[in-house]
Every structure is written in structure tokens, then in C-alpha cells.
Amino acid sequence: MLLIREIMHCKPGKVRPMVEKSLAMSKLMDKHGMGRMRISTDLAGERYWTVVMEMESPSLGDFDKMMKGEGMTEDAGKEFEKIMQGYHDLVDFGRREIFRIEG
């Protein structure tokens, strides 16, 4: 099992809108059987205004299929697009980390 962390460093004052988008995305993922994301914000760290979205995936192949929207209905794809519309305006910098869960 893999742990995928999407780390978004938001622009000043844009953490709350990014959290709201992430929570809506998590609910939609759960609704469509893709699992839920865990959403976290920083209390202290290397950079301020950080939002972390964590999810689990059985394999890189499964994660890749999810990112491509394979098996998703057209309506679900449109819902995802609507939720994430404009998120680039909220984010200054981002990265993805992938870990193997050992126990």
C-alpha cells in the first residue's frame, strides 16, 4: 500500500479556499469509491500556508489510473473539474510525495 501526499504551499490568505476545495474533493472521491483524503494544514514548518492532502493507493498503477480518471463517469469528471476550477490561483508551489506503508 502506498501513501500519497499532495503538498500545496498556498499564496497568503488562500489556505482556507484550498482547504474547502480539498474537503469537497475528498467527499466526491469517497462518493465515487476512490477513498477519502485526509486534509491537514501547517502549525509550523518550512513554509507558511501549507495544505497537505493524503490518500492511500494499492499501487502506482492504480494511482495513475485514478489521476487519469479511468473508470469515472463523465458527470463525476465534470464535478471534479468544477471543484478544482481556479485552484492554481490559490497555490504558489506544490509537490507530491509517495511512500510505501511498512506497517
How would you name each of these model-derived features?
Residues 9, 54-56:
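Short hydrophobic/aromatic beta-strand micro-patches
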Residues 1-2, 103:
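Absolute protein N-terminus
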Residues 41-47, 87:
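A short beta-turn/loop motif at secondary-structure boundaries
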Residues 3-8:
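Active-site-flanking beta-strand signature of metal-NTP-handling nucleotidyl enzymes
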Residues 20-38, 56-95:
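An amphipathic, aromatic/His-enriched active-site/gating alpha helix that lines ligand/cofactor pockets
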Residues 9-20:
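Short, surface-exposed ligand-recognition loops at beta-strand->loop->(often short) alpha-helix junctions
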Residues 94-102:
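Long, low-complexity, Ser/Thr/Gly/Pro-rich intrinsically disordered segments that act as flexible linkers
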